[in-house]
A protein has these predicted regions:
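Cytosolic juxtamembrane helix and N-cap/initiation of the first transmembrane helix
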Residues: 1-17, 133, 144, 148-151
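Interfacial segments of alpha-helical transmembrane regions
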Residues: 2-14, 67-88
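Hydrophobic transmembrane helix segments
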Residues: 15-51
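Core segments of alpha-helical transmembrane spans in multipass integral membrane proteins
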Residues: 43-66, 84-86
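Hydrophobic alpha-helical transmembrane segments
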Residues: 52-57, 120-144
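Alpha-helical transmembrane segments and their membrane-interface junctions
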Residues: 58-73, 139-152
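C-terminal halves and exits of single transmembrane alpha-helices
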Residues: 82-103
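Juxtamembrane non-transmembrane "cap" segments at the membrane-aqueous interface
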Residues: 96-117
Length: 152
């Protein structure tokens, strides 16, 4: 495996785990709106959503870190990465980009309007949704990870 691909994968995975663990808990200026997030979900729900969202990514990242010195990662680990980040890519399409670009989802649009009110956005609103900058960056990390997985 090319070292740059391995380090790129480890770096992107680490960023995504940090994002999943912290983005609903740590103030990030105009990149987040913690008051709106806490107003739409209870602390208990937020805790469990954070844990359950981060767990698969944290586990596969941890195993990749254990194998970081290996010349080539085991096939089972590569498969695990594909399942994890393939699901993440499908999830971003279903939750964000499909409703933004292709189909209307009024309930989702209203939820996003409340949760991400006042956050930084640079894309125009479509179908009632304007993806916030922080999630766009996260989605780019997911896409980057999938691209690097094709180079394993």
């Amino acid at each position: 495996m090319v070292p740059a691909v391995k380090f790129g994968l480890l770096g992107l995975q680490g960023l995504q785990v940090v994002f999943l663990l912290l983005h609903d808990w740590v103030p990030l200026g105009r990149l987040s709106n913690l008051k709106a997030v806490r107003g739409s979900d209870s602390t208990t729900k937020l805790f469990w959503v954070t844990v359950l969202s981060a767990l698969p990514f944290g586990l596969v990242f941890g195993v990749c870190c254990v194998h970081w010195r290996d010349q080539r990662w085991p096939v089972w680990l590569q498969s695990w990465l594909w399942y994890t980040y393939g699901a993440a890519l499908v999830g971003t399409i279903i939750a964000w980009w499909g409703p933004y670009l292709l189909w209307e989802s009024p309930e989702r649009a209203e939820r996003y309007r409340v949760r991400f009110a006042g956050t930084m956005k640079f894309l125009p609103e479509r179908n009632g949704i304007a993806p916030d900058t922080l999630h766009v960056l996260y989605h780019l990390c997911v896409v980057g990870t999938v691209v690097l997985l094709t180079m394993l």
